[in-house]
């Protein structure tokens, strides 16, 4: 057997080097990014979302439709984060269509921050809660949650509790006012009403003669959002396509 001289051995793996770690692959390099957009506020672009692309010509629409996200009202009305007003309201959106690189979303509810809700509750005051189901013009059903807290009626008294009869009347007036202003309107108008304090001030004005209160709409929850319901057409159903093709062949 021939013995090779020192230094004449050939390495099997010429490219490998000792002590050099393998570079980590970026997990987002194979993702496709889409813009989250809506048309209800001055700022229409609300960030991006992504999904792994497994094939070059794969349609990612089924994976994107139905995604939800929430945006602060200050970011919806001002593009500059330094000048944006810190609002306690967060508007929720849901993706219902994909157009190019844009995920078009629709209104899907509103919620006030936890800090604002807990800050309303005070010691020796009465908390009045109400929830009202409403129906918008497009047939969508929503549930509106309202919280009201009694104010100081007598400055010399330490406790400011409302009677049970007063609580019933206040809750009844809140329900009537909500149905009067929100029931049967369009979704765009509903969003405009929720983005201001006008309806809450109306609650306080109508209930002031019974007992002074501080009111706020804390949440709007979708029960049946017609904008998010995708109607399956006849052309999209493969069973109907097969039956149509068979009938065409028989007619020929």
Curated annotation (Swiss-Prot):
The keyword Signal does not apply. InterPro entries: Ribosomal_eS1, Ribosomal_eS1_euk. The keyword Metal-binding does not apply. GO terms for molecular function: structural constituent of ribosome. Signal peptide: none annotated. GO terms for cellular component: cytosolic small ribosomal subunit. It holds the Pfam family Ribosomal_S3Ae. It is found in: Cytoplasm. Keywords: Cytoplasm, Ribonucleoprotein, Ribosomal protein. SMART domains: Ribosomal_S3Ae. It comes from the Eukaryota. GO terms for biological process: translation. Its main location: cytoplasm. Belongs to the eukaryotic ribosomal protein eS1 family. Component of the small ribosomal subunit. Mature ribosomes consist of a small (40S) and a large (60S) subunit. The 40S subunit contains about 33 different proteins and 1 molecule of RNA (18S). The 60S subunit contains about 49 different proteins and 3 molecules of RNA (25S, 5.8S and 5S). PANTHER family: 40S RIBOSOMAL PROTEIN S3A. This is Small ribosomal subunit protein eS1. It comes from Enterocytozoon bieneusi (strain H348). The lineage of its organism: Eukaryota, Fungi, Fungi incertae sedis, Microsporidia, Enterocytozoonidae. The gene is RPS1.
């Amino acid at each position: 057997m021939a013995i090779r001289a020192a230094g004449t051995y050939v390495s099997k793996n010429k490219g490998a080097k000792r002590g050099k770690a393998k570079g980590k692959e970026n997990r987002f390099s194979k993702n496709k990014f889409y813009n989250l957009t809506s048309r209800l506020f001055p700022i229409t672009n609300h960030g991006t979302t992504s999904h792994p692309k497994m094939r070059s010509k794969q349609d990612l629409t089924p994976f994107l439709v139905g995604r939800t996200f929430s945006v602060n009202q200050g970011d919806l009305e001002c593009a500059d984060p330094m000048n944006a007003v810190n609002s306690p309201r967060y508007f929720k959106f849901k993706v219902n269509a994909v157009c190019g690189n844009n995920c078009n979303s629709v209104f899907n509810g509103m919620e006030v921050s936890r800090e604002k809700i807990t800050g309303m509750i005070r010691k020796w005051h009465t908390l009045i809660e109400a929830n009202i189901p409403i129906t918008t013009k497009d047939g969508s059903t929503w549930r509106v949650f309202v919280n009201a807290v009694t104010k100081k009626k007598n400055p010399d008294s330490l406790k400011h509790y409302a009677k049970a009869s007063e609580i019933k009347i206040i809750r009844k007036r809140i329900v009537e006012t909500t149905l009067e202003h929100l029931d049967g309107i369009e979704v765009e108008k509903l969003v405009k009403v929720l983005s201001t304090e006008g309806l809450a001030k109306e609650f306080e004005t109508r209930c002031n003669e019974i007992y002074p209160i501080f009111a706020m709409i804390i949440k709007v929850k979708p029960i049946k959002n017609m904008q998010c319901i995708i109607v399956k057409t006849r052309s999209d159903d493969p069973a109907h396509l097969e039956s149509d093709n068979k009938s065409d062949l028989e007619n020929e």
